[in-house]
């Protein structure tokens, strides 16, 4: 029997490894920029064309490489960062596995130009799909320049699953932000299709944060700095009043490396307990400095998950540091015993009333309220013996009235699509309003109760309104008939560049809803018009919320983005729990609900109505 196990060619092995390391153009930029920082670069330029699908170029002024190192750098597991296993626990560099360049070269066409200081000529190396196509001496500046073209050219399936240019650019900006926030001493530029997106000089950390997210964020931040024998924790946390449901900037860094850490995130949010509304988040930029021997970086392909040896102790230190910062800046509620602000109430002067005698009351000292015999005779009188005849008379009087309800009162079977689609909503298909009463009742400002043939229908008024508005906005987008209401004084909304890319992707759908936005440059937009019917809502918060929701959902397809926008706007414009409705308003809401195609559930799957049948109601009173 012949042997069937064989070694894979290096090119195939590199493509397999690239599947973990290089997932999208943003992954290429992350690896190349981190290599530049490890090489001691003080200035890094990133140039991107078509969101990295066509080309990516990273230029640095670092140490550069010799001819031999340039050739060896594209071999798997070739690295200058470590030499033995013990070095994994003393890492001070971003890279160490020796996989990044080999993985990039396996799925793209790469050109490297590099020169070390003191060398007259540098080296140019050309590689395509792991195959070296050329190497020669060239004149070039000190440092390295990597040009990556046609990413995934030899893996069509991977290239097909890349997202739109706007989404991929947003991913690039996210990775770029993570790198520049942890390296404020390095200057960076980022260009996309020839346009400059970022130009960040080397500055202090606070100025770097402002350079990335805008000057407005400076007013939201409180500085934090705690140094212990175990860990140093520094950075900034947001003021409680700046909390938001979506779009909070939340970053953890350890030893100059970005990481995700849900456990430490909980420590921060616990410190804000009772300071921010439930479900809202605050921004934070937290930097840990820990002995490399006490953390394990090598547990995730992208190195974004890090294990700490003293995780629980650091959790306590972090939580205490945040609480101390909030207390130091008076950002926590306190009990104020200061009497300076109390009103000046004059003391009562009784001298003018000294001659007044108090009234005297006489009473019988022999009176005993517990003596039954002393109680006055009861004035209770028995009801008339003819009370049955009295009620019988009222009954005859009521039956003699010729009462007929309004024939135009709401009937669910006329508005519901259940008749047109038998079996679509089995539990409400016979739930038309009986007795044609046209009368609805509101319970605790949240539920609408109405009588139906099968029993009692209970409707969540907010969810019903969301269902109605969602269908309305989806129809407006599909028909491109959104009605815009002009603003007398346009609002200005500011977005970081990573969110601008998402905004551009959904801009057309926003216009169909009725929003009118003008690009002012630098991530600023003027809101000149908003959809009619959303009076009282903050347009800035509304647009930011839609952008953040689109970012979370990924905006995979156009229809999904349209649904996200319609649902976000519907939730914002719907009536709130506790809002008192007139009977006419409740009737209109019920009519509108059963005029939509799917009245039973909200677009995100929450129950809108429930019916308690007549038998269950009768059982309650047996």
From Swiss-Prot:
Could you tell me the superkingdom of the organism this chain comes from? Bacteria
Signal peptide location in the record? Answer: none
Query: Which segments carry the region annotation Disordered?
Result: 399-422
InterPro entries assigned to the protein according to its UniProt record, in alphabetical order: DNA_mismatch_repair_CS, DNA_mismatch_repair_MutL, DNA_mismatch_S5_2-like, HATPase_C_sf, MutL/Mlh/PMS, MutL/Mlh/Pms-like, MutL_C, MutL_C_dimsub
Instruction: Kindly state which keywords UniProt assigns to this record, in alphabetical order.
Output: DNA damage, DNA repair
Q: What's an example GO cellular component term for this entry? A: mismatch repair complex
CDD domains annotated for this entry?
HATPase_MutL-MLH-PMS-like (cd16926), MutL_Trans (cd00782)
- Protein name per UniProt: DNA mismatch repair protein MutL
Q: Which organism is it from?
A: Phocaeicola vulgatus (strain ATCC 8482 / DSM 1447 / JCM 5826 / CCUG 4940 / NBRC 14291 / NCTC 11154)
Taxonomy, top ranks, is: Bacteria, Pseudomonadati, Bacteroidota, Bacteroidia, Bacteroidales
